[in-house]
Structure formats: C-alpha cells, structure tokens
C-alpha cells in the first residue's frame, strides 16, 4: 500500500491540488490531516508522501502548519513518511515553500517537488506521475 497525506487550510488550495492529482486512480490512498485542532488525530500506518502548504507569511520559523507538526510528532506517523511535497507563494522569496525543506531535514526524507498555491496543470501531472513512479519503484516497507 502507499498513500498521500495532505494538509489544507480553509482556503482549500492544497485540497484542490490533491483532488486534481486523482491519486486513487493510480492506486494511492489519500488522507487529510484534520484542520480543526479538536478533531480526532489522523493515524497513518502505510508508506506515504506528505503534501503541505507553507504558512508564516515569509517567516520560515512558522512555515510548517501546527496541525502538520502535531501529525509528524507522533512517532508512529513519522515512521511511515517517505517524502515531502510543498506548496508556497513565490511572493515570499526565500521562504517560498519553506515547509518542504524543513520537514525534509527533520524527517530525513527527500523534498520531491514544490509548487505555487494551487499549482498548474503541469504541476498536477508532474506530481501525480512522480508519486506513482516513486511508489512503483521504491520498496514500501
């Protein structure tokens, strides 16, 4: 099994991007990290790639959404992460998609791709095919 885990704010930019990728059609499960802090926590027990937006308005110290931090602070969830894909806003210069490299470093996984806001058609294609190839070429245990 393989999965994509994503977080999307109320803007739904990341959610729409993930929907356009149509991961289930290539055999990849999709799980959303809850937006509301009082929601039941998400527990993932299969290899996954995480897709995250960047927060903080250019402040890299606030780049990773708190909900994502909480999810990854669970050792059982962190055990299954295999890569990270980040979105961001190029208006923030050096902090563009900064959540990706932060998670990549802390979890010792590759930063696989970055895209702006909701992504383009080309981004959707690249991510969908990249995720499909990654899980078909990489042992999942």
Curated annotation (Swiss-Prot):
GO terms for biological process: protein modification process. One of its GO terms (molecular function) is FMN binding. Belongs to the NrdI family. HAMAP family: NrdI. Probably involved in ribonucleotide reductase function. This is Protein NrdI. It comes from Bifidobacterium animalis subsp. lactis (strain AD011). The lineage of its organism: Bacteria, Bacillati, Actinomycetota, Actinomycetes, Bifidobacteriales.
